[in-house]
């Protein structure tokens, strides 16, 4: 599906630079080349030639590239002028090209929109290009590049294919069976549904890791009053925002710092000391601390090694909720007083780090541990930098698959199962942009790009 009009835009950032690129796409690309280059460059070959005005005056000299449809970024004829990065010269050449009848200035993201419309990329890949441009770390850039190369798209396409095959199997049963499903069919379909749900769960886990990569994991520091929580918070955040005193209950509200470890974002939360208290303000702080614990990715439980001699979390904190024990690291602080050595070890599946926030002994162990922890959270089967629409559509698809499973278990109703699968397939196709080419929808996606992309 080619668009009839031709577009042009400066494809490099505003301002002076070593190079400035003007990109043209559409049927007029050949005509533009003959006017402003005096000839059509060889296809896919960089040529160093003069750039001319309409009147034949030399404007600049640089590299010209021509890509013939459909073997181009947009799927249309594409011409690029790679000139010196002078804003004045670039704008003059741009205005000259725009003066040719049938040429117009490209809208933000329109080159990529045409690439999508012409089947060169899907919506996931287009959005991943935006994620790559806006990435704040090497890891985020790598993850975006994986999606550009089709990793996420392949996962969704495989799900769609699985659902299509299952729908065909069900519809054959409907056509050739007097009753609904026989026992063999039911077991086969149940197995296929379970497999689809499992693959959706894996994708959702990749979404969670992608969110950590993009937004940062949440590390909550907890412990009894005066155990050294705020001192460790200050060390990790690199400042002294938390007040440190020997008075119990000094921290009464949540303190939050956003830091980077090896270019991976990390959110550190300092909380009120957890204890029984009659102080109304301190009680509010403790309730807020408990709320942060529930939404954390990992917990650092700070203990005073000079008082708490045990490494067993059940003895340190007997009433602690059992379902979050697996994401707790025990930090044995104040080893300068207890005379323990700085180290990391494992006791009953909990990592234990011995350090002194006062002297700095063992702090390097904690920093390295947090870096490794981030890598562990991110490296399981890859990360997907998911958009809100991806998350919502995959959730809808999963709900439809679960509904299909319930209908199969309870009623053996083939028509209803097939319909739930059809809706699930439609949700997954929306992620790729299949059968969803309305102007409003595409404008919402591509208007976030810069002009020239």
UniProtKB/Swiss-Prot annotation:
GO terms, molecular function: GTP binding; GTPase activity; metal ion binding
CDD domains for this protein: trmE, TrmE_N
Record-listed E.C. numbers: 3.6.-.-
Domain TrmE-type G, residue spans: 216-375
PROSITE patterns named among the record's database cross-references: G_TRME
Top EC group: hydrolase
GO cellular component, one term: cytosol
Annotated residues for binding of GTP: 226-231, 245-251, 270-273
Xref: InterPro entries: G_TrmE (IPR031168), GTP-bd (IPR006073), GTP-bd_TrmE_N (IPR018948), GTPase_MnmE (IPR004520), MnmE_dom2 (IPR027368), MnmE_helical (IPR025867), P-loop_NTPase (IPR027417), Small_GTP-bd (IPR005225)
Binding site for K(+): 226, 245, 247, 250
Family indicated by similarity: Belongs to the TRAFAC class TrmE-Era-EngA-EngB-Septin-like GTPase superfamily. TrmE GTPase family.
Subunit structure: Homodimer. Heterotetramer of two MnmE and two MnmG subunits.
The protein's name in its UniProt record: tRNA modification GTPase MnmE
């Amino acid at each position: 599906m080619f668009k009839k009009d031709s577009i042009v835009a400066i494809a490099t950032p505003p301002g002076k630079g070593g190079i400035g690129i003007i990109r043209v796409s559409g049927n007029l690309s050949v005509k533009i080349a003959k006017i402003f280059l005096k000839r059509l460059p060889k296809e896919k070959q960089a040529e160093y030639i003069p750039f001319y005005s309409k009147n034949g005056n030399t404007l600049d000299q640089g590299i010209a590239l021509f890509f013939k449809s459909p073997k181009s970024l947009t799927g249309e004829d594409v011409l690029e002028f790679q000139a010196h990065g002078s804003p004045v010269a670039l704008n003059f050449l741009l205005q000259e090209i725009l003066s040719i009848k049938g040429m117009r200035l490209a809208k933000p993201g329109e080159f990529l929109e045409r690439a999508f419309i012409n089947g060169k990329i899907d919506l996931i890949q287009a959005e991943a290009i935006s994620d790559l441009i806006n990435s704040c770390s090497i890891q985020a850039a790598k993850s975006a590049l994986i999606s550009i190369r089709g990793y996420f798209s392949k996962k969704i396409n495989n799900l769609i294919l699985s659902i299509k095959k299952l729908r065909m199997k069900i519809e054959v049963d409907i056509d050739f069976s007097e009753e609904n499903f026989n026992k063999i069919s039911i077991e086969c379909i149940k197995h296929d549904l379970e497999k689809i749900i499992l693959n959706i769960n894996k994708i959702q886990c990749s979404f969670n890791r992608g969110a950590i990569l993009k937004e940062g994991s949440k590390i909550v520091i907890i412990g009894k009053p005066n155990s050294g929580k705020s001192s460790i918070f200050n060390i990790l955040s690199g400042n002294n925002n938390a007040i440190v005193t020997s008075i119990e209950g000094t921290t009464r509200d949540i303190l939050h710092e956003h830091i980077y470890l090896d270019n991976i974002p990390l959110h550190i939360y300092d909380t009120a000391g957890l204890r029984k208290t009659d102080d109304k303000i301190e009680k509010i702080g403790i309730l807020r601390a408990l709320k942060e614990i529930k939404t954390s990715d990992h917990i650092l439980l700070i203990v005073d090694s000079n008082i708490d001699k045990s490494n067993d979390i059940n003895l340190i904190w007997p009433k602690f909720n059992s379902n979050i024990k697996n994401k707790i690291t025990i930090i044995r602080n104040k080893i300068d007083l207890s005379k323990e050595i700085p180290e990391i070890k494992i006791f009953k599946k909990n990592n234990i780090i011995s350090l002194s926030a006062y002297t700095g002994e063992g702090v390097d162990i904690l920093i390295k541990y947090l870096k490794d922890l981030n890598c562990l959270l991110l490296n399981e089967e890859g990360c997907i930098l998911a958009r809100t629409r991806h998350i919502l559509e995959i959730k809808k698809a999963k709900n439809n698959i679960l509904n299909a499973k319930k209908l199969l278990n309870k009623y053996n109703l083939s028509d209803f199962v097939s319909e739930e699968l059809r809706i699930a397939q439609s949700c997954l196709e929306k992620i790729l942009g299949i059968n969803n080419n309305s102007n409003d929808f595409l404008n919402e996606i591509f208007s976030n790009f810069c002009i020239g992309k």
